[in-house]
Amino acid sequence: MKAIIQRVKSSSVTVEGEVISEIKQGLMCLIGIGRDDTKEDAEYITRKILNLRLWKNEDGTKNWDRSVQQMDYEILFVSQFTLFAQLKGNKQSYHLAMAPELSKQFYLDFLENAKKSYKPEKIKDGRFGAMMDVQLINDGPVTIQLDSKEK
């Protein structure tokens, strides 16, 4: 399982001209599900996202001290199978991504676990399988790449 985690001042997802999800300050996370991913991979990614220390402490004297949970910020998750793109020349293949008919339930289970592990009202998401316009205002920018197979 892969995740691209971006610290944001705000982020939103629009589908067919309608804003379906938005957050204020927090994290916008692109989530890719691999064909061999398991529940343990999802739990690892969730734990890392919730506990990464990406913000300064309260008095601003120490960088990289506080997590999204400690800051009580929101998280916007967006499913992104293209994180598993394999390139051969200029053509990409997605054979390492989990099949859509399996990955949808896997993704929904991942979201449920994130809600149980944090605060349900702080977890937002896009629309699985939809063409989405994702807008964000980076904070920093701070961007972290995670891969559950590279622990």
Curated annotation (Swiss-Prot):
Main location: cytoplasm
NCBIfam families in UniProt: D-aminoacyl-tRNA deacylase (TIGR00256)
GO terms for biological process, alphabetical: D-amino acid catabolic process; tRNA metabolic process
SUPFAM superfamilies: DTD-like (SSF69500)
Entries under CDD domains matching the protein: Dtyr_deacylase
Family matches, as InterPro entries: Daa-tRNA_deacyls_DTD, DTD-like_sf
Name the record gives this protein: D-aminoacyl-tRNA deacylase
EC top class, as a word: hydrolase
Gene Ontology MF: a single term: D-tyrosyl-tRNA(Tyr) deacylase activity
Domain comment as written in the entry: A Gly-cisPro motif from one monomer fits into the active site of the other monomer to allow specific chiral rejection of L-amino acids.
Keywords, comma-separated and alphabetical: Cytoplasm, Hydrolase, RNA-binding, tRNA-binding
Subcellular location per the Swiss-Prot or TrEMBL entry: Cytoplasm
Function: An aminoacyl-tRNA editing enzyme that deacylates mischarged D-aminoacyl-tRNAs. Also deacylates mischarged glycyl-tRNA(Ala), protecting cells against glycine mischarging by AlaRS. Acts via tRNA-based rather than protein-based catalysis; rejects L-amino acids rather than detecting D-amino acids in the active site. By recycling D-aminoacyl-tRNA to D-amino acids and free tRNA molecules, this enzyme counteracts the toxicity associated with the formation of D-aminoacyl-tRNA entities in vivo and helps enforce protein L-homochirality.
Organism: Dictyostelium discoideum (Social amoeba)
Family: Belongs to the DTD family.
Reactions listed under catalytic activity: glycyl-tRNA(Ala) + H2O = tRNA(Ala) + glycine + H(+); a D-aminoacyl-tRNA + H2O = a tRNA + a D-alpha-amino acid + H(+)
